[in-house]
């Protein structure tokens, strides 16, 4: 042990060298710690900086989006504010010509709920109409958008300008549309359907206005107005007026009695000529007609015409006030007809012949088909003996010797919009509607709107008289027809249609299909 110790030669210089090495190792250790600390600090600072700038970018984007949203909201608010201002101004316009009730907005005034709905509907309408492709808003991060931003902004300004220019007219039509909805109790599923109906209404309204400006010119002797069909499209109207069912020849041969045979059987001697009969005949003055009924959205005109004919002749025969009989019974129970999908008055009379018809109170009208025939409800059934018919040249004779008769007509868009006067417009080429012929007459052209049943605006009558020429003040001949579209349509539910002096010109198809019940 001692020898080993002796082998170690320890000097002062060796000890100093060892001390230096120890210090060097300590310094390296501290340097490593510092480097690690600096690295960690640098990484932390870098991370903080990255996070900061990322957050700042998100904040900028959010602010930009917020500003854009605020800009869009401001634009919408400006539009709505403009609409409100126009609505207020429009309400004060009371000096415009009043073609009919929709020129004034009294019902809209003060109705906050309706005004809000009006603005909502119109705002959506204007956005869809003025910008159908939904032009995207300007995006500052989109290079393509940046490149064309000037053009896009100009386009958007032009679009907005066009919107603002058309707002006055649209707010005017929209306010009329809301009054129309109230009057006819129109209910729509959603705002999209309401917009479609608004467009249909606006089209028909402009058509009516254009027609009424021409009344008195070019021989036009009737006026139009919007009614329960004015929110229909042309396709819907064509679908509503269905072609009348054909009559099997064998049934017609078996059950129909010609007019002259019927008169001979009842020992009635008719006049020798049509001109021997009175110049006027109006069964509205005889107290044998009920007020015009309303078939609604059911294609049951054939039932209303035939039942109305039966009611009138029943009252005339027994000299009593008219009693209402059941259209719904015929709609549900007449298997030869197709209910609300169409029929024919002859087939309706054939049902009366075999089964009778009950009072309306026992079998009330629903304006739709029932799955079952509920004729057990009928406490009393009145039958007829035979079915009569007449030729076109016998219409005036029929009205005088029999009474009201059922005829079929060809209804057109112009016919539907009729409001008053003597209709001389275009008719459909096919018979598609059944009505009750209740009289005929004649009138001087200048006095067309002086009829007691006419309720035409005085301004229209004034314009009509200014437009006709004194040299053209001849006599006009017409039929009086009761429709089944309620008493709000036409002249209290009636229409006057032009005819020639003898009544055999079959205008609008009147005279082609003529039937009446023989009690």
UniProtKB/Swiss-Prot annotation:
Keywords: Disulfide bond, Glycoprotein, Hydrolase, Membrane, Protease, Signal-anchor, Thiol protease, Transmembrane, Transmembrane helix, Zymogen. One of its GO terms (molecular function) is cysteine-type peptidase activity. This is Berghepain-1. The gene is BP1. The keyword Protease applies. Disulfide bonds join 298-340, 333-373, 358-378, 427-508. SMART domains: Inhibitor_I29 (SM00848), Pept_C1 (SM00645). The chain crosses the membrane at residues 33-53. Belongs to the peptidase C1 family. Its EC number is 3.4.22.-. Residues 54-519 are lumenal. It is found in: Membrane. Pfam families: Inhibitor_I29 (PF08246), Peptidase_C1 (PF00112). Coiled coil: none annotated. One of its GO terms (biological process) is entry into host cell by a symbiont-containing vacuole. Disruption phenotype: During mosquito A.stephensi infection, number of oocysts and salivary gland sporozoites, and sporozoite gliding motility are normal. However, development of blood stage parasitemia is delayed in C57BL/6 and Swiss Webster mice intravenously injected with knockout sporozoites. Parasitemia initially increases but then plateaus for a few days to rise again more rapidly and mice die between days 14 and 19 post-infection with high parasitemia. Preferentially infects host reticulocytes.
